[in-house]
């Protein structure tokens, strides 16, 4: 599966000067919503991701995603794997479980995102699950932005990767984009201003 081509064909592989949620800057941004707006394509990607997880023998009961970006990817993964789906969301900047969702003691979860960069949001969701007695047995995403080690792709992790090394992480593709701290961003130094994805229709 050529994930890069899928993103480009969907108009989801953006080039410019972007302000990421981490506060860092990048010349490239993956707008997964453009890929997932096609239910047939979203289903195909989720089926592929579920097959990868099954191949590695990971047993799980449910899927959890951090809102907002991970919800569509996580829901589709749960559908493909025939599992329950829930999501966490930030309340006053604290990742929380709301809307009547419950976690059973010992319930095994895959935490799923659309894109994982350092894995910070996915890790926050995992901590919520574990604090309620659940067990996170792995992480998944459509794509990895090159920082975290992907079990099925064989790449190495980078120092700022936040996902735990003792839990497998699965993805359909790996995008190695340069990410810059604002004070060291060459795009800023050239006079360009970073925009937050979505602020200008992206």
UniProtKB/Swiss-Prot annotation:
Residues engaged in binding 5-phospho-alpha-D-ribose 1-diphosphate: 93, 113-121
Where does this protein act, in terms of pathway? Pyrimidine metabolism; UMP biosynthesis via de novo pathway; UMP from orotate: step 1/2
**Which Gene3D superfamilies does the record cross-reference, listed alphabetically?**
3.40.50.2020
Binding site residues for orotate: 117, 145
Q: Catalyses which reaction?
A: orotidine 5'-phosphate + diphosphate = orotate + 5-phospho-alpha-D-ribose 1-diphosphate
Give the Pfam families listed for this entry: Pribosyltran
Q: What is its EC number?
A: 2.4.2.10
Listed under GO biological process in this entry are: 'de novo' UMP biosynthetic process; pyrimidine nucleobase biosynthetic process
- Keywords associated with the record: Glycosyltransferase, Magnesium, Pyrimidine biosynthesis, Transferase
Q: Which InterPro entries match?
A: OPRT, Orotate_PRibTrfase_bac, PRibTrfase_dom, PRTase-like
Chain's role: Catalyzes the transfer of a ribosyl phosphate group from 5-phosphoribose 1-diphosphate to orotate, leading to the formation of orotidine monophosphate (OMP).
What is the protein name given in its UniProt record?
A: Orotate phosphoribosyltransferase
Organism in which the protein naturally occurs:
Campylobacter concisus (strain 13826)
